[in-house]
Amino acid sequence: MDCVIFEEVAVNFTPEEWALLDHAQRSLYRDVMLETCRNLASLDCYIYVRTSGSSSQRDVFGNGISNDEEIVKFTGSDSWSIFGENWRFDNTGDQHQIPQRHLRSQLGRLCESNEGHQCGETLSQTANLLVHKSYPTEAKPSECTKCGKAFENRQRSHTGQRPCKECGQACSCLSCQSPPMKTQTVEKPCNCQDSRTASVTYVKSLSSKKSYECQKCGKAFICPSSFRGHVNSHHGQKTHACKVCGKTFMYYSYLTRHVRTHTGEKPYECKECGKAFSCPSYFREHVRTHTGEKPYECKHCGKSFSCYSSFRDHVRTHTGEKPCQCKHCGKAFTCYSSLREHGRTHSGEKPYECKECGKAFRYPSSLRAHMRMHTGEKPYVCKQCGKAFGCPTYFRRHVKTHSGVKPYQCKECGKAYSFSSSLRIHVRTHTGEKPFECKHCGKAFSCHSSLREHVRTHSGEKPYECNQCGKAFSHAQYFQKHVRSHSGVKPYECTECGKAYSCSSSLRVHVRTHTGERPYECKQCGKTFRYLASLQAHVRTHAGA
């Protein structure tokens, strides 16, 4: 059973605002409140009404509730109960309308009475008066010093100010004061010293809808409790703790969802496929996979989404907004999931483990790509040349090689590259920078992939195994070269003479016979060579001398 605070579903007015409403608008208010209560009753919900000064209170099941809350429980078509005491009415007319008519008359008398507005009480206290009717005769509710009217909650004053929920001092917080009835925006800074709602913008329109706008990020809320929870998120306050593992949450709904991870409860089941979910929002999103519904449409490009979070993250690609910032390095991201994955680069966490070889990965996509090495699956096929890839990143890089576009050019030598990462690695050949150092032997590399392959010489790991002969390799390029020895494929062809090779390095060496390039120079005598092996043999002649 869910619990609902009355203020979350009620619409409050000050006496001045209520006086501006005509009879039709007041009737509309009563109808809305009655419909809300009826809907909550049909959902078997508790309605909590905040009060003050109550000592030990019990709900309708005899369970204790907090000292500053009272509980109203609407239980049926011809009665409702308050603190377990049932109110029954004459069984005349439509059974389902009796309690609503009675509540309507209560609201009507209280709302339209002149006495009810002399002391500045808002309509949210109508519920307090209804609850008060169920108290024993010896209960002594507080009495208003100006008009003599009795209320259980006596903390609201005739000044229009109400006590701050944090410190008890009178202030003009968003939940304590309402602006005039005309549509406007009014700054209401809180006067108390310890308030998280230090400065908010409170907007009220003639439709009686309230919008609580966060001064920090501009996000607006209709429900005050949702707004307060949002403000807490800026301050990092997590007041709801899990009794099982101690994890804390900003919102009670998040805690409820988390608890189900311990209990395994999945109350939301899809009627189409039987899949069950612990969270209603995940369930709703899943249902849309069956219906095809995509209610969230981007105003910038017209793209539609079935999931609000995907829609929100997409919109940020247009606005450039990156609200999720890393606390370690300051890098910002458009969505929390990207920030979470980035955080693993700092923590070193690798939660995704291969069941075949035990290797762990930081990202699920990396694990999927790795698994294809075991299965041999290569689902990404190039339409131009038919080459297949197991990793989407390598596939995208390969596709760009067909376009011939090389937008990244080296300022030192003019050499151009298709990828910015390739240019960065190349630039290090000019600067001599080698930021990747082996922890075992201290050898440094300009490229991380080179370090990764080097580390395997220490660990003895050979993850690349030939399916045909079982031979294993520590380097991907050696493995690919070996596989071509079985297939006879020679994809690297010289444009000058047409000679083909099974690996790109062999083609590069061959091309030097046409260009005359001799990139390997002896530092002692200045002699140049076409091949690295030739230079190494030459250097030995100096050492022997």
From Swiss-Prot:
Compartments annotated for it: namely:
Nucleus
Q: Is Disulfide bond among the key words of this record?
A: no
* UniProt keyword annotations, A-Z: DNA-binding, Metal-binding, Nucleus, Repeat, Transcription, Transcription regulation, Zinc, Zinc-finger
The record's Gene Ontology biological-process terms are: regulation of transcription by RNA polymerase II
* Record has Nucleotide-binding as a keyword: no
Chief place where the protein resides: nucleus
One Gene Ontology term of the molecular function aspect = DNA-binding transcription factor activity, RNA polymerase II-specific
Q: What does this protein do?
A: May be involved in transcriptional regulation.
Question: Which PANTHER family is this protein grouped with?
Answer: FINGER PUTATIVE TRANSCRIPTION FACTOR FAMILY-RELATED (PTHR24384), ZINC FINGER PROTEIN 977 (PTHR24384:SF247)
Q: What is the protein's name according to its record?
A: Zinc finger protein 77
